[in-house]
Design a protein with these regions (language model features):
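Positively charged, low-complexity terminal tracts
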Residues: 1-78
Length: 78
């Protein structure tokens, strides 16, 4: 596997299993996440599956998910 870096094309991340929320839009407009072999977490837009992926440490991903769960971003979608 190539060295994984922030912003790299997701298409070059061979062998990565992408997951999305069960609450996601069935038409494919979703945020997808994947665990990388080194434990980091990659994020991509399902509308552009070969496009750039953002890569976060586990701590960064954990802080984001906790913020989502606690409603910190609700004002952006309501």
């Amino acid at each position: 596997m190539n060295q994984l870096y922030n912003g790299m094309p997701a298409a070059l991340m061979g062998g990565i299993v992408w997951r999305k929320s069960h609450f996601s839009n069935p038409s494919g407009n979703c945020v997808e996440l994947a665990e990388l072999p080194d434990g980091r977490v990659a994020m991509r837009n399902s509308r552009d599956p070969e496009g750039p992926a953002l890569i976060y440490t586990r701590g960064e991903a954990d802080a984001f998910v906790r913020g989502v769960k606690s409603g910190e971003f609700d004002d952006l979608i309501t």
